[in-house]
């Protein structure tokens, strides 16, 4: 009855900050805000300004109360618009951390709880944000970024539009502040270009025009910040290309890129840059991202329908929301990369989620954009730097759908064939190479066994199969082709004409009014499904992808729409000079029709090099060219020299067997570095002085167009030093890492990034050479390579048992050091996600380096039995060779105790009990005793910060849990001597006396061990604990015997799982041991 008023009071309380229903439970964030507000009100309610300021100043002096006060004041600002200005003034006066607590909690609130905030709180967030920006509060950009994430795409609700417009007003008002933060500029540009697409409704015309004016202005003024947005920014720009301001931007991007920024070379530069995951992430609501992660990581394949239905109802219920599908597909492809364990499990795969998103889309425009999002990375794929996980979903959707859902596979295949040819005709050859690279790597990595079941399926119509044969003839079996034409990607042949120039094509873009216009939501009535593309004349055009019939059956390659919107291919682009093998993909340039005159200082040597194409003439030219000042060469002459030099260097490299067949024969070694490219290395090796600008420019171009240059230089230095040392053994040659640094500077990248990239390419090219160079790499690049996780992973993924043996030999001989003891723990942490075999190899190498346990023992609490079996098994073997110490035991007992116990801890305690039982018992007992206050007031001391931090882990419950599970593991009395030692008995007594009833009940069997000893040793020692036990009278003796019988029954239930166990013998043995130990402690006077 007394609780009823309290219940009614809590029920009547209505939160001013959150919208709550009767079934909602408050979580930690909501409770924290409301609790802080209530506590603050209790202290300042009814006070005047001066008294309140004094109280707030006093509160601010204490860390915990300062944080609570800051949250309470933030609550007031978000819920009381009238008091907000005064509260903000109070915060600025008393805050002693630059408002970092307020900013951090506001960021958390926006990221986690924005959807539950009241309408008034949402308005106040904008007010607070404006004040923060106005006064340039630190880290306010974090709040802004999370607010941008809440401005969802495909949502034209009043709440969302209010947020979008008010954020825009802040950005316009404080433009100067905004431009000082490049990342924020990028996020805003990316977000608003995406949002503009959704605001095509005439009712939103004023908002849309404001967005367009601001976004275009920001893009043009800060284009150097926009360039890193990469290819997905181009994809978004296509969707708004018909808006006049964006159309003019497209003209400048295509025809006058230097007007936007001096370093901008055109649209292909953007298309080659992979868009950062953070920008793809910022276009998804945080709540939506969490739901998507749950779907892709926790839902079993076959059980996903109800989750998908919920997702459909929640996020795809309006016509505008269809545009969201492209954002989701790009996010899934580029951000959600499942581990190997997840790929092998029965969790719903990414391709199934993407297939659902595409097949459930009823809007033809959104459907076409969703397909473009699926294949977008294919068009520009470079296997040397792009991730296969970005192209895997596309092929798997088609491959797994061909049997039961052939219309999905047919639609996607038709789209892929057409987009390859029509996305951007000027660069069709490069895009076709990207798609070829994708399919080639898919087969090389066995993502699917082969393409024949897909490309030659009888479920595809005849026109589509012909289209596939025309576009992917290399991947279609000869039996499926009537007459095989010349391969589309032949191997490179010798180039007879050594004079080249860049193709220039300055055509005028003409915009046809009957073309598709996503920005205005209008399109050609003759085409049902269309996608915005760039044709050969750089016009924004359309391409038909499919025609939907009334019964939802799909018709592909319809003759009526075959030619609609398909631009004529430029007749000049008919040769195949651009087709190179997969590992040598570098596009060539068109030849000059006339020769360019060069300065006399280099003309003769250059012509000789071009004619003879050998290393000697190349080095002669380099001697003349190295000191040539920049003023001597015009830009056209420099381009002429660089283009021809690069092509000759690339053409003279062997296509196969680029490395020596023998690692000892001098003839083979010398021949393998006799090509002109190695002449450049030799020249740099002998001339380390700073070169003139033309030489540096040429070196940069060579590095850009020949990606193998890095690992070929490492190979050259190994061979060159080996050969020179053999010629003159008294003066051994050494690696000159300074030469490699020159190459890194030419690529404008850090040496660590270059080294990792080059070693990765080398391992993929030739594992044997990679392992041969490995000791030299770790010796010469010691500061970079040692403890480098990326290089270590490259090594582990390629070694077999013999390779591991050879590496261990090198380590044992002192020729190779892969680890330093100091930071090796980070390497092991990183390796916990590696494949099992890779982890076993890693631990072999760790053992070879004699890494002491103290260097890695901090990992003990982090390792989980279910997820890290490899690391735990090796750690246990290391522990077997160690004596138990206070620190090791503390870390081990800090491990989380599962319901069934921790077999790792139990195993370690068992084998230590065999050799160090008494020491182990004392260490655990002292650790357990330290968790409780001392019984003697004279021994109470104020703990220091360091001691309190270390003593807080493990907790008393953790220690008791591990002791309990260890007790359960003991069978027939083996290993239980741990509990009979004096210190352990006292520790258990102390634990029992300081435990609450639930703990006593939970560990009753464990405490019973101390209880038994209490009757025979501890509890009957008199006042001082030193006197001899008094003899018992007959009555007491009977009681005592009864107690022993009860204890015996307890012991039997604790230790026996077997009817025939000899618990009586164990009890007698244990008691006799305790008696012997007690006898030693009796003073002589007794």
From Swiss-Prot:
The keyword Nucleus applies. Keywords: Cytoplasm, Nucleus, Phosphoprotein. It is found in: Nucleus; Cytoplasm. The modification Phosphoserine is found at residues 1056-1057, 1061-1062. Signal peptide: none annotated. It comes from the Eukaryota. The keyword Ligase does not apply. Residues 558-581, 932-955, 1015-1086 are annotated as: Disordered. Residues 1069-1080 have a biased composition (Basic residues). Residues 946-955 have a biased composition (Low complexity). One of its GO terms (cellular component) is cytoplasm. Component of the integrator complex, a multiprotein complex that terminates RNA polymerase II (Pol II) transcription in the promoter-proximal region of genes. The integrator complex provides a quality checkpoint during transcription elongation by driving premature transcription termination of transcripts that are unfavorably configured for transcriptional elongation: the complex terminates transcription by (1) catalyzing dephosphorylation of the C-terminal domain (CTD) of Pol II subunit Polr2A/Rbp1 and Spt5, and (2) degrading the exiting nascent RNA transcript via endonuclease activity. Belongs to the multiprotein complex Integrator, at least composed of IntS1, IntS2, IntS3, IntS4, omd/IntS5, IntS6, defl/IntS7, IntS8, IntS9, IntS10, IntS11, IntS12, asun/IntS13, IntS14 and IntS15. The core complex associates with protein phosphatase 2A subunits mts/PP2A and Pp2A-29B, to form the Integrator-PP2A (INTAC) complex. Belongs to the Integrator subunit 3 family. This is Integrator complex subunit 3 homolog. It comes from Drosophila willistoni. The gene is IntS3.
């Amino acid at each position: 009855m007394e609780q009823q008023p309290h219940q009614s009071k809590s029920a009547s309380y209505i939160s001013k900050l959150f919208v709550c229903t009767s079934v909602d439970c408050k979580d930690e964030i909501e409770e924290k805000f409301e609790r802080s507000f209530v506590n603050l009100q209790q202290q300042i309610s009814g006070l005047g300004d001066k008294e309140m300021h004094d109280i707030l100043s006093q509160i601010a002096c204490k860390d915990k109360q300062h944080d609570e006060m800051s949250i309470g004041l933030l609550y007031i600002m978000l819920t009381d618009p009238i008091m907000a200005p005064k509260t903000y003034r109070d915060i600025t006066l008393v805050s002693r951390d630059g408002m970092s607590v307020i900013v951090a909690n506001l960021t958390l609130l926006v990221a986690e709880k924005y959807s539950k905030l009241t309408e008034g709180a949402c308005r106040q967030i904008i007010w607070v944000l404006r004040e923060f920006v106005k006064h340039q509060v630190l880290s306010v950009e974090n709040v802004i970024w999370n607010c941008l994430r809440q401005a969802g795409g495909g949502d034209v609700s009043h709440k969302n539009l209010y947020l979008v417009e008010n954020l825009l007003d802040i950005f316009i008002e404080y433009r100067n502040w905004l431009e000082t933060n490049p990342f924020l500029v990028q996020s805003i540009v990316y977000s608003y270009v995406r949002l503009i697409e959704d605001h095509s409704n005439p009712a939103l015309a004023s908002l849309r025009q404001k967005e367009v004016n601001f976004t275009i202005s920001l893009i043009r003024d800060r284009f150097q910040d926009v360039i890193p947005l990469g290819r997905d920014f181009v994809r978004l720009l296509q969707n708004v290309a018909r808006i006049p301001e964006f159309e003019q931007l497209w003209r400048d991007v295509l025809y006058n890129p230097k007007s936007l920024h001096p370093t901008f070379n055109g649209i292909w530069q953007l298309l080659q840059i992979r868009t950062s995951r953070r920008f793809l992430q910022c276009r998804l609501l945080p709540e939506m991202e969490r739901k998507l992660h749950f779907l892709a990581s926790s839902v079993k394949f076959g059980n996903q329908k109800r989750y998908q239905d919920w997702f459909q109802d929640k996020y795809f219920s309006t016509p505008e929301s269809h545009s969201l599908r492209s954002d989701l597909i790009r996010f899934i492809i580029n951000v959600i990369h499942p581990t190997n364990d997840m790929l092998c499990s029965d969790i719903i795969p990414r391709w199934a989620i993407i297939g659902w998103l595409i097949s459930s889309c009823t809007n033809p425009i959104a459907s076409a954009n969703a397909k473009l999002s699926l294949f977008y990375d294919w068009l520009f794929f470079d296997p040397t730097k792009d991730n296969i996980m970005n192209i895997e979903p596309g092929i798997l959707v088609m491959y797994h759908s061909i049997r039961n859902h052939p219309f999905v596979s047919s639609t996607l295949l038709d789209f892929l064939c057409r987009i390859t040819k029509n996305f951007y005709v000027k660069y069709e050859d490069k895009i076709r190479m990207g798609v070829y690279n994708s399919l080639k790597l898919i087969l090389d990595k066995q993502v699917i066994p082969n393409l024949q079941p897909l490309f030659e399926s009888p479920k595809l119509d005849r026109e589509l199969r012909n289209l596939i044969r025309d576009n992917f003839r290399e991947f279609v079996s000869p039996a499926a082709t009537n007459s095989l034409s010349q391969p589309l990607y032949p191997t490179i042949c010798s180039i007879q004409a050594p004079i080249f120039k860049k193709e220039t094509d300055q055509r005028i873009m003409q915009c046809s009014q009957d073309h598709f216009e996503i920005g205005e939501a209008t399109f050609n009535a003759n085409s049902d499904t269309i996608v915005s593309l760039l044709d050969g004349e750089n016009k924004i055009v359309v391409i038909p992808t499919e025609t939907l019939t009334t019964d939802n059956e799909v018709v592909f390659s319809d003759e009526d729409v075959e030619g609609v919107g398909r631009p004529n291919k430029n007749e000049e682009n008919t040769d195949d000079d651009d087709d190179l093998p997969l590992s040598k993909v570098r596009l060539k340039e068109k030849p000059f029709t006339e020769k360019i005159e060069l300065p006399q200082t280099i003309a003769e040597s250059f012509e000789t090099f071009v004619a003879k194409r050998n290393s000697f003439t190349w080095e002669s030219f380099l001697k003349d060219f190295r000191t040539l000042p920049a003023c001597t060469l015009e830009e056209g002459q420099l381009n002429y020299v660089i283009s021809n030099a690069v092509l000759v260097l690339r053409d003279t490299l062997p296509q196969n067997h680029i490395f020596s067949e023998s690692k000892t024969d001098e003839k083979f070694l010398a021949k393998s570095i006799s090509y002109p490219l190695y002449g450049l290395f030799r020249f740099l090796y002998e001339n380390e002085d700073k070169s003139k600008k033309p030489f540096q420019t040429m070196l940069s171009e060579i590095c850009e167009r020949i990606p193998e240059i890095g690992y070929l230089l490492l190979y050259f230095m190994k061979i060159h030093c080996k050969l020179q040392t053999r010629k003159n053994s008294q003066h051994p040659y050494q690696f000159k890492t300074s030469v490699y640094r020159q190459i890194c500077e030419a690529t404008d990248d850090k040496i660590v990034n270059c080294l990792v990239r080059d070693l990765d390419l080398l391992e993929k090219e030739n594992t044997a050479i990679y392992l041969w160079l490995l000791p030299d790499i770790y010796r010469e690049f010691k500061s970079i390579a040692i403890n480098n996780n990326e290089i270590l992973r490259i090594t582990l993924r390629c070694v077999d048992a013999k390779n591991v043996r050879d590496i261990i030999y090198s380590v044992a001989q002192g020729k190779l050091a892969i680890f330093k003891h100091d930071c090796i723990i980070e390497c092991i942490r990183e390796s916990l996600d590696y494949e099992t075999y890779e982890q076993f190899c890693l631990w072999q190498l760790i053992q070879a380096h004699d890494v002491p346990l103290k260097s890695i023992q901090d990992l003990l609490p982090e390792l989980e039995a279910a997820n890290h079996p490899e690391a735990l098994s090796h750690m246990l073997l290391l522990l077997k060779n160690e004596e138990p110490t206070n620190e090791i035991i503390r870390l081990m007992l800090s491990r989380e105790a599962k319901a069934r116990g921790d077999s790792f801890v139990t195993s370690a305690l068992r084998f230590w009990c065999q050799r160090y039982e008494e020491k182990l018992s004392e260490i655990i007992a002292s650790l357990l005793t330290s968790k409780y206050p001392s019984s003697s007031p004279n021994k109470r001391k104020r703990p220091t910060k360091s001691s309190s931090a270390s003593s807080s882990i493990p907790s008393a419950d953790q220690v008791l849990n591990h002791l309990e599970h260890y007790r359960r593991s003991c069978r027939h009395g083996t290993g239980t001597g741990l509990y009979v030692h004096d210190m352990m008995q006292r520790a258990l007594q102390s634990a029992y006396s300081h435990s609450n009833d639930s703990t006593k009940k939970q560990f009753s069997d464990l405490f019973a061990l101390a209880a038994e000893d209490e009757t025979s040793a501890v509890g009957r020692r008199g006042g001082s604990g030193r006197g001899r036990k008094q003899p018992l009278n007959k009555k007491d003796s009977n009681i005592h015997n009864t107690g022993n019988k009860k204890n015996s029954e307890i012991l039997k239930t604790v230790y026996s799982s077997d009817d025939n166990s000899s618990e009586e013998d164990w009890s007698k043995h244990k008691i006799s041991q305790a008696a012997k130990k007690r006898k030693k402690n009796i003073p002589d006077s007794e």
